[in-house]
Curated annotation (Swiss-Prot):
Gene3D superfamilies: Nucleic acid-binding proteins. InterPro entries: NA-bd_OB-fold, Ribosomal_uS12, Ribosomal_uS12_bac. GO terms for cellular component: small ribosomal subunit. Part of the 30S ribosomal subunit. Contacts proteins S8 and S17. May interact with IF1 in the 30S initiation complex. The keyword tRNA-binding applies. The lineage of its organism: Bacteria, Bacillati, Actinomycetota, Rubrobacteria, Rubrobacterales. The modification 3-methylthioaspartic acid is found at D89. Belongs to the universal ribosomal protein uS12 family. This is Small ribosomal subunit protein uS12.
Length: 122
């Protein structure tokens, strides 16, 4: 515990908050262009082929974004909207593609939880 005199001489250091999504630079979402669309395998104990896209954002950052939902229409040069949100079993994936915005179509045949996958009411 510092003395009052020590605090007068040198005040306490403020703790800096570390952001989970630095590439968005405080924005809720950012637009970007897909540079690569591929699949990757998750960490143990899970097993799947998770769809990911490498996206160059408008601010120059290049990020890896997860493409949620079943099936997608993304390919190289597709313009997508990227939001924050990590995928726990994919190391290094801290962003998600917003379905139903720009070139990323909504999930076909989705009945429940449609707003998260950009599906219109059918």
């Amino acid at each position: 515990m510092p003395t009052t005199n020590q605090l007068v001489r040198k005040e306490r250091k403020r703790q800096t908050k570390k952001t989970a999504t630095p590439a968005l630079q405080g924005s809720p979402q950012r637009r970007g262009v897909c540079t690569r669309v591929s699949t990757t395998t998750p960490k143990k104990p899970n097993s799947a082929l998770r769809k990911i896209a490498r996206v160059r954002l408008t601010n120059g950052h290049e990020v890896t974004a997860y493409v949620p939902g079943e099936g997608h229409n993304l390919q190289e040069h597709s313009v997508v909207l990227v939001r924050g949100g990590r995928v726990k079993d994919l190391p290094g994936v801290r962003y998600k593609v917003v379905r139903g915005a720009l070139d990323a179509l909504g999930v076909e045949g989705r009945k429940q939880g449609r707003s998260k996958y950009g599906t219109k009411k059918s």
